[in-house]
């Protein structure tokens, strides 16, 4: 056991948590992409025509799917308005995307937490919750990277997931809570 893992229950590894968190974030994005990229491409056609008319680069579908993935964590996307203000939107909450997208991150995180607890061999609720919550190590890193990767800029205008809410909800709250729940289930149902 490494020095950084010494405070963790026996068998729980931050390295495994990082790997599981990374895999879970990427898988969640890919599920969202495969499911919604065609619809998003169609929805962006009108916006992209206007943007290109004024000499800007079109919004790539992969970035807009990223916004939708953050929306599935209840993280709104901020975009500028005429007159210098900004507005936040959640495409799922606004009815522009399937509500079922809200279950993608929690389900994947519960499964990851479950797998982490089982692989660590822990058998009690607290150790399982800690093992499952260790998914935060990788998930947080990719949640922060996603905030940068899914930022779209045209001229002086920028659209992006809300930074602080993205870190707090998508990066910390979701993996700790849902990974912890999965880990607790994995530990307490082990035979």
Regions picked out by a protein language model, each given a short descriptive name:
Residues 114-191:
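Alpha-helical transmembrane segments of multi-pass integral membrane proteins
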Residues 17-18, 96-105, 163-176:
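Alpha-helical transmembrane segments of polytopic membrane proteins
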Residues 25-99, 151-167:
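Long, glycine/tryptophan/cysteine-rich extracytoplasmic
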Residues 1-27, 124-129, 187-191:
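Haloarchaeal acidic low-complexity proteome signature biased toward cell-envelope/secretome components but also
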Residues 18, 63, 80-82, 129, ...:
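Generic detector of intrinsically disordered, low-complexity, polar/charged segments
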Residues 92-116:
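Hydrophobic alpha-helical transmembrane segments
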């Amino acid at each position: 056991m490494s020095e950084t893992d010494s405070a963790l229950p026996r068998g729980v590894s931050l390295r495994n948590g990082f790997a599981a968190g990374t895999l879970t974030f990427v898988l969640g994005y890919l599920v969202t992409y495969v499911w919604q990229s065609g619809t998003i491409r169609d929805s962006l056609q009108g916006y992209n025509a206007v943007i290109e008319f004024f000499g800007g680069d079109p919004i790539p579908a992969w970035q807009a799917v990223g916004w939708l993935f953050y929306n599935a964590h209840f993280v709104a996307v901020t975009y500028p308005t005429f007159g210098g203000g900004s507005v936040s939107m959640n495409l799922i909450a606004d009815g522009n995307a399937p509500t079922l997208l809200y279950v993608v991150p929690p389900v994947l995180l519960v499964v990851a937490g479950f797998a982490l607890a089982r692989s660590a061999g822990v058998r009690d609720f607290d150790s399982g919750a800690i093992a499952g919550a260790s998914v935060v190590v990788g998930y947080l890193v990719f949640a922060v990277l996603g905030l940068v990767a899914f930022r779209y800029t045209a001229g002086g205008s920028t659209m992006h997931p809300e930074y602080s809410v993205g870190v707090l909800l998508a990066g910390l709250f979701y993996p700790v809570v849902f990974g912890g729940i999965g880990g607790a289930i994995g530990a307490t149902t082990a035979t």
